[in-house]
Amino acid sequence: MKAIIFFIGCLMLIDLVAGSRSGYPVTQKGCVYSCFWGSNWWCNAECTALGGSSGYCAWPSCWCYSLPDNRNIWGSYPNNCGKK
């Protein structure tokens, strides 16, 4: 049992050190990429185009895995969507 807990702890530490950033990517205007149920293929294509490993539609927005540090994600800076 201790070995399993140690193994899970190591996996969590590896994820923390590797710094994989996952989240809702935002456009240049600060808006999230909108999607609808069943458009996982579109979100996956958008996420990989942004440098992520993959993505899916977490309605109403695309969720991306392993985004590079130069991509902004929702919540990492003030929301400016729809503002001039």
From Swiss-Prot:
Residues 1-19 form the signal peptide. It is found in: Secreted. InterPro entries: LCN-type_CS_alpha_beta_dom, Scorpion_toxin-like, Scorpion_toxin-like_sf, Scorpion_toxinL, Scorpion_toxinL/defensin. The modification Cysteine amide is found at C81. GO terms for molecular function: sodium channel inhibitor activity; toxin activity. GO terms for biological process: defense response. Residues 21-82 form the LCN-type CS-alpha/beta domain. It comes from the Eukaryota. The keyword Transferase does not apply. Expressed by the venom gland. Belongs to the long (4 C-C) scorpion toxin superfamily. Sodium channel inhibitor family. Beta subfamily. Beta toxins bind voltage-independently at site-4 of sodium channels (Nav) and shift the voltage of activation toward more negative potentials thereby affecting sodium channel activation and promoting spontaneous and repetitive firing. Has the structural arrangement of an alpha-helix connected to antiparallel beta-sheets by disulfide bonds (CS-alpha/beta). This is Toxin To5. It comes from Tityus obscurus.
